[in-house]
């Protein structure tokens, strides 16, 4: 199934819940259209995983993930997304891996031209920490 995945350039934003009970952005990237040279030869991302290691600014104990598909004309189907503390390069500490849910389900679809936000997830996110976010398509 072909998908124009606005990569993890599916504007990905990580939010933490502050003591003042407001969501605060701790990491984000600007969405952009897909460049053909960044995609697989057949433009198919089905049954693939995309991992991005990011360094957050502030930590927290409850987090959410915001994903965007605003530049695509096709929906993007996601089988699951998990976060874990990053080790060296793209390695993770598997003991810390936790899956995000969307409406209490691990699977979700990001409609074309839309954004979605995960359910809140209890996760020990430390200030200036590197975490790995893995999207299974």
Regions found by a protein language model. Give the residues of each.
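N-terminal secretory targeting modules
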Residues: 18-137
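Bacterial Sec-dependent N-terminal signal peptides
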Residues: 1-23
């Amino acid at each position: 199934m072909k998908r124009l995945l606005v990569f993890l350039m599916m504007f990905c934003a990580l939010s933490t819940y502050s003591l003042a009970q407001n969501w605060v952005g701790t990491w984000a990237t600007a969405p952009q259209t897909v460049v053909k040279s960044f995609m697989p030869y057949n433009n198919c991302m089905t049954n693939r995983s995309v991992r991005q290691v990011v360094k957050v600014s502030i930590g927290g104990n409850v987090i959410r993930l915001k994903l965007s598909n605003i530049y695509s004309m096709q929906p993007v189907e996601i089988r699951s997304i998990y976060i874990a503390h990053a080790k060296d390069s793209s390695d993770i500490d598997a003991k810390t891996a936790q899956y995000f849910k969307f409406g209490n389900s691990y699977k979700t679809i990001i409609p074309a031209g839309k954004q979605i936000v995960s359910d809140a997830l209890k996760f020990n996110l430390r200030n200036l920490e590197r975490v790995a976010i893995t999207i299974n398509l």
